[in-house]
């Protein structure tokens, strides 16, 4: 196995990003950092804030939380003044805070639409965690609100900005694998009782919303196509009370216009390593830990030299690339590479998957 240095992978990522995002990288960035208000101070927000601390383009300038003691503690870590700490009731006062250019929405899924729309009305750009929201109608309202307010909306698909995923896309686009025939992608974990993700009202659905969406989105960005047919099956195996509201397991297949067939599985009932494997007429590639925060590894066999590369970058590097991209777009008035429309499309496919599996959403 070849283990690249951080510098090697940073260079690879920069080259891949330059090829993919060439128009945006031609503009000059502002010397002023983009100020973020972080809405929700849970685990994923911690990853994001630690990343922004390392950024030369972004900074944390406000916090929004229902727990003032926690917010005060985090504010001290990031140099956020007391006057820039908000709760969910007075959040709209952020309109008068010039230090806040954008908000990062890191709340339960059911709250994404409300706070994206409120942020847009306050004139703030929005970086919203995935899944975008609960349904297509909410996604459309979020996009409309941001367009009306003339602010940018980006969905936090961090894998779009990660070098190993970009390396896989580059190999596929170059024709190294020949004509892609099929893709496999599972991802899941054994969820603990009592998590908010088991509430349909808060989460919108089960593992498909939470982790299955990684596989769904990966198949779309790997093929560069949109699925034209979807079939799905769902099941509950562990009747232990966890899955009274959401599915435990769901599997689906997608056929793309070129004929590529993708097979995906997600679960809340078992630890299922997240990866994708792409089969082509001239070879194959696989990315292990494809959706993890670190430890991504790409292997490939085709008519060229075999590939076995481990990305040495550590968490929160994905979040840093994501934040830097959005800040660059804000500073240079550019459209993000994963805009609201990307989330809207996934919400449409999630709806199709659930309908095919006989699940009402």
Region roles according to the model:
Residues 3-4, 8-30, 102-104, 326-361:
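C-terminal helix-rich "cap/oligomerization" subdomain common to oxidoreductases
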């Amino acid at each position: 196995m070849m283990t690249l240095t951080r510098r090697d992978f940073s260079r690879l990522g920069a080259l891949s990003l330059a090829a993919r995002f060439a128009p945006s990288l031609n503009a000059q960035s502002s010397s002023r950092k983009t100020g973020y208000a972080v809405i929700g101070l849970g685990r994923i927000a911690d990853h994001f804030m630690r990343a922004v601390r390392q950024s030369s383009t972004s900074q944390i300038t406000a916090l929004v939380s229902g727990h003032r003691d926690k917010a005060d503690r985090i504010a001290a870590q990031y140099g956020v003044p007391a006057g820039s700490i908000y709760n969910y009731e007075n959040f709209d006062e952020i309109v008068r805070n010039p230090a806040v250019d954008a908000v990062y929405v890191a709340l339960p899924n059911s709250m994404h639409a409300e706070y994206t729309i409120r942020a847009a009305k306050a004139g703030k750009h929005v970086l919203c965690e995935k899944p975008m929201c609960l349904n297509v109608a909410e996604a459309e309202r979020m996009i409309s609100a941001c367009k009306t307010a003339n602010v940018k909306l980006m969905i936090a698909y961090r894998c779009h900005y990660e070098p190993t995923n970009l390396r896989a896309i580059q190999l596929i686009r170059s024709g190294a694998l020949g004509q892609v025939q099929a893709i496999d992608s599972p991802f899941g974990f054994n969820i603990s009782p009592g998590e908010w993700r088991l509430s349909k009202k808060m989460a919108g659905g089960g593992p498909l919303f939470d982790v299955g969406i990684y596989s769904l989105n990966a198949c779309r960005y790997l093929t560069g196509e949109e699925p034209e047919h979807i079939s799905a099956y769902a099941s509950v195996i562990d009747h232990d009370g966890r899955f009274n509201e959401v599915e435990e397991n769901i599997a689906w297949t997608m056929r793309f216009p070129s004929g590529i067939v993708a097979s995906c599985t997600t679960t809340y009932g078992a630890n299922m390593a997240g990866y994708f494997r792409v089969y082509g007429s001239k070879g194959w590639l696989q990315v292990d830990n494809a959706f993890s925060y670190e430890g991504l590894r790409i292997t490939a066999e085709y008519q060229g030299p075999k590939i076995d590369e481990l990305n040495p970058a550590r968490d929160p590097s994905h979040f840093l690339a994501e934040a830097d991209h959005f800040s660059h777009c804000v500073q240079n008035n550019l459209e993000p590479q994963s805009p609201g429309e990307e989330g809207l499309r996934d919400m449409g496919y999630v709806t199709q998957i659930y309908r095919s599996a006989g699940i009402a959403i």
